[in-house]
Amino acid sequence: MGKIQELSPELINQIAAGEVIESAHSVVKELMENSMDASATQVDVESKDGGLSLLRITDNGTGIEPEDLEPALKRHATSKIQDYKDLESVLSYGFRGEALASIASVSRLTLESGTKEQKTAWKTRSVAGKISEKEEIPGFIGTKILVEELFFNTPVRRKFLKSIRSEDKKIRDRVTTQALAREDVRFRLFQDGKEVFVLPTRENKKERIIDLFGENFRDHLLEVSLERGGIQATGYISDPDFYKSNRTGQFIFINGRPIEIKYSSVLLKKAYDELLPPNGHPYCFLFFEIDPSRVDVNVHPAKREIRFLDEDGFNGFFLALIQKELRSSTPVSFLELKKRLLKPAPETHSTTSFYQARSSGKNPLLGRELFSGVSKQEGFELDRMGPGVSLSELTDERVKHSSFVPKKHFGVLFETFILAEAEDGFYIIDQHTAHERIRYEEVLRKLEKRNYGIQPLLTPIRIDVSKQEQEDILNRKKEYEEVGIFLDPLGEDSIVLREIPAYMEPGQEKEIVLDFLNRTEGKETSEPELYDLMAKCVACRSAIKKGDQLSDPILAEILNRLSYCENPSRCPHGRPTLVKLSRDDLERMFHRK
């Protein structure tokens, strides 16, 4: 008997499911798209235990004819296309005929559907792809699909899934994305018996965006539109003062389909040019209509990606769409806007977006001491950063970890690089990354030992968020309190920061907390990972900057503290803090050896 064997249909379907069905959120996506193709105007999504125990999608679409129930659960059976020419002009969400069969092959699935032509509806079941006979049930119009025990027959797949909370968030994100594409459809989402949101139909996309992301978006959205070269685009982008520190606020649709476009975030950054800081990413909700023959949606089994016939042409159109509105909506030049962005922000605790974490652009340390006065017992302490770590404490706890033992310094080059001599050579030290390493290790040590106090804010800080974001943050309330961040709900779409850890200096807490929330958004983090992220946020925001004027005592203190760091050669993000030239290096350079 030969070694090459034909695979069974069941195994073929399970392999196909691995490409199409990543987890419960993939099931939700595929079934909602079927509802859209069936002209549904109402879609209900229910999940239990992150969708692994139960998923139910109910719609009021056109329904499935009785004779089509069984074929609908078979692989490569579809009503969307008939030949290759149809594939070249596909406008429906689904067309591959894989989704239902893939879902059925890894779950216990019940399919109920009725049409307006039928007085009764019909039901069929599938267990791991094995379809039972259909049966007649009381009539209704639409389709109900119940998916139970997802991946029950592929336990390895379950092992790779994240926590229930993480899977719940992915489902919410999927429904959110689909709801953005179809404001003319009412969506309801329930998770573990709790109503997450009800989205009524809307007349325009802006109202749907506000429903999902919060009222604070209303005054920060710029409408965009452009038509040329066979492409039509509409949508909204955020103004330059409203942005995130990650790309999760960017939604792009091609012919109604949510798509991941290669380099889209790069194009957005290029379009905004100088209007955003390096770590700022704008929101965008963009909807493109393109002749289907000019795009290939059959690139990925899950239909996440798309290929353009003229990619360069599309990229040029994309840039023009964004830049046109930014220029027309801004009465001053890009250069003037850049100057405005670099002005210090007013000292106020006014409302700010959850994702808006802009630095004032001016380092408050300029023109004043970075360290407090000298104490022979405790050494210098960092100014504006709360209590630092004394040199006596460092000496008691550990020894120096490298041969970097500074003897004297010679000043600063280009207002950035400290020049110093040590036992083993000549060093050039980046003042920012060096101080960042110092602050990172100090804060991390305090967190690990829980050696810090909590201080209330005289004026609590309000942070506007969407309902979903508020729920996500409050679900992690206890985790955030482990690093000294105390957040409470304020209404339905805000949170309030009332207390902060003493390792933060008042005046920086807003930027640090917003940065921390952004870095932890949607991520499963252990306690050590939370400590690491918080220490990095504090270090990044509080470290002295390039161009800060440093006195001789401050320079000496930076070098001394750096020599006690566990890893003095790198900042927390991996950039070098110092470059060494040994005596041998110098002598070889001058041909003395």
From Swiss-Prot:
Keywords: DNA damage, DNA repair. GO terms for molecular function: ATP binding; ATP hydrolysis activity; ATP-dependent DNA damage sensor activity; mismatched DNA binding. Pfam families: DNA_mis_repair (PF01119), HATPase_c_3 (PF13589), MutL_C (PF08676). The keyword Disulfide bond does not apply. GO terms for cellular component: mismatch repair complex. The keyword Manganese does not apply. InterPro entries: DNA_mismatch_repair_CS, DNA_mismatch_repair_MutL, DNA_mismatch_S5_2-like, HATPase_C_sf, MutL/Mlh/PMS, MutL/Mlh/Pms-like, MutL_C, MutL_C_dimsub. It comes from the Bacteria. One of its GO terms (biological process) is mismatch repair. CDD domains: HATPase_MutL-MLH-PMS-like (cd16926), MutL_Trans (cd00782). Belongs to the DNA mismatch repair MutL/HexB family. This protein is involved in the repair of mismatches in DNA. It is required for dam-dependent methyl-directed DNA mismatch repair. May act as a 'molecular matchmaker', a protein that promotes the formation of a stable complex between two or more DNA-binding proteins in an ATP-dependent manner without itself being part of a final effector complex. This is DNA mismatch repair protein MutL. It comes from Leptospira interrogans serogroup Icterohaemorrhagiae serovar Lai (strain 56601).
